[in-house]
Amino acid sequence: HFYKLNLSKNLPPNLIASLLPGIPLTNIGEAMKPAAMAATLVEHLWKDAQSPFYSMINTPLYRGGVISLNSIKKPIEELIKDSNNFIGMNTSSAGIIDKELILKDIYNYWEAASKVFSHAWNIRSTESRLMHGVGLWAMFMLMPKVIEKCHDEHPGVEEIITHLGLIAPYCHWTAEDGDWENVDSFGLNITWNGFENTASGKTLISKYINRTYRDVIRDATL
């Protein structure tokens, strides 16, 4: 009951996220299960040497990363709320999920992203919006759509690279990439670091990236 009792104590979100993986899902209410599952997955992402995010995520125990713990946990939590986003989310009554399948998709997708956007990878979020909460959110929201369009149910890195490569010319994660262009229906342009990690900022960039992917994949021959 530690987690429930301390929600009202204003503990730092990153500390709460780091505590959740140690709590069995059977001891957590339904409303909190997405957060607990996401925290468990994120723990694998920063601890596993095979993960594309290995040693890149800051936690209360490790401060050498470039990504905020909450910035990566929140989009995963959002995806988990809809079981259609992950094949491995067919849960049993005991709340058991196929962690390995979910991690496989996350690993492959983000390994591909690290190759396609190598210039924006593993650098401070002040230098790369891809490592910022708003960029992580947008790319995680795109992930189910990319996987759905791939030939394999659990696509490999190379196939995902082909898909992400289609949107690469339209993504402006760093200063060298220039401004984001025609972000909305009014032709809005935004500086490379102009998207804020707010609800409106995340919605705007997510809609832009999803719309761009929809348009380029429609005309692509893969």
Tell me what each language-model feature is.
Residues 1-222:
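Accessory terminal alpha-helical modules
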